From Swiss-Prot:
It comes from Pseudomonas savastanoi pv. phaseolicola (strain 1448A / Race 6). One of its GO terms (biological process) is L-arginine biosynthetic process. Keywords: Amino-acid biosynthesis, Arginine biosynthesis, ATP-binding, Cytoplasm, Ligase, Nucleotide-binding. L-aspartate binds at T120, N124, D125. The keyword ATP-binding applies. GO terms for molecular function: argininosuccinate synthase activity; ATP binding. HAMAP family: Arg_succ_synth_type1 (MF_00005). Pathway: Amino-acid biosynthesis; L-arginine biosynthesis; L-arginine from L-ornithine and carbamoyl phosphate: step 2/3. It is found in: Cytoplasm. It catalyses: L-citrulline + L-aspartate + ATP = 2-(N(omega)-L-arginino)succinate + AMP + diphosphate + H(+). Belongs to the argininosuccinate synthase family. Type 1 subfamily. Homotetramer. This is Argininosuccinate synthase. Gene3D superfamilies: Argininosuccinate synthetase, chain A, domain 2 (3.90.1260.10), HUPs (3.40.50.620), Single helix bin (1.20.5.470).
Amino acid sequence: MADVNKVVLAYSGGLDTSVILKWLQDTYNCEVVTFTADLGQGEEVEPARAKAQAMGVKEIYIDDLREEFVRDFVFPMFRANTVYEGEYLLGTSIARPLIAKRLIEIANETGADAISHGATGKGNDQVRFELGAYALKPGVKVIAPWREWDLLSREKLMDYAEKHNIPIERHGKKKSPYSMDANLLHISYEGGVLEDTWTEHEEDMWRWTKSPEDAPNVATYLELTYRNGDIVALDGVEMTPATVLATLNRIGGENGIGRLDIVENRYVGMKSRGCYETPGGTIMLRAHRAIESITLDREVAHLKDELMAKYASLIYTGYWWSPERLMLQQMIDASQAHVNGVVRLKLYKGNVIVTGRKSDDSLFDANIATFEDDAGAYDQADAAGFIKLNALRMRIAANKGRKLF
């Protein structure tokens, strides 16, 4: 094995990363620093400290990154109305660049010459972690155990843990049949019965949201206040970014909002089925498009929509720290200078319905758009010349005998 003196491990305290911790110590004979991120996944992160200490780890980092995650990653992404392949709100993808950033920061702080993660060799996360790491620290060594070892099943991992006295419970509360990932933006489910694309997901799989059928029979109204494209208040109460998202998750979940069952194209080449709960993000996307509808110039809005697919792909495939993503972000952020105002929404049984939008920066002029007498604000006779000029190229083609069908 290559010389490694100290490695920073992205550590959850679960089976996989606990085995990786011991495997790194034995295989590389190196010191391991553990890093556990609180991204709002809803699980207690402190037990990871005790587990790491029990395995001889001296430097343990447990960081609350919830505000940074939403402020510097989720909100910038939503300024672009980002959706991958028309549906996926990128809840897993957008968390990886922050984890990579913090891994490198800790490596620099502790003098570590390597980082390690628990992503498998089949998925997108290995790419996301490592592209970010190399962008931020080109000379860092990355250790990806799933690409090196032969512990390729859960049973083998359990046997390894038992053999090496790793503090993992073999018997305890029932384990979910799904591979799950959660943060403040979403929770995902993969594997198990979902690997059959014809099998319907089970109702008891969902953890954050009520079934739309069981959601309240009375609609919930709320108002979101925007400043420069970001939500700053809910029902007039100013909130931090993480509090905004957590509150929308709760309200959206109660109203059956944000469930998704999709098959997506992974960067590594395969198709993968996943189920997602993104209640707050679903509300945010609808509301942001609503406030932009009255504050953005038409051509700016259309250009943003054209760029969004590329921007979404960059995030999905792990290029958050790339120069092209940073360039696009500057354009997107510049477009948000006048995206200010309030959006009123009605939430009802899985639906997010826009019922109002207002802004001091609104480009909607009722005097011009009215169906009533506009008192000369718009001269309808001007439309004749506009239409003739725009039809000119088609008239020329027709006069040349070009056939359309």
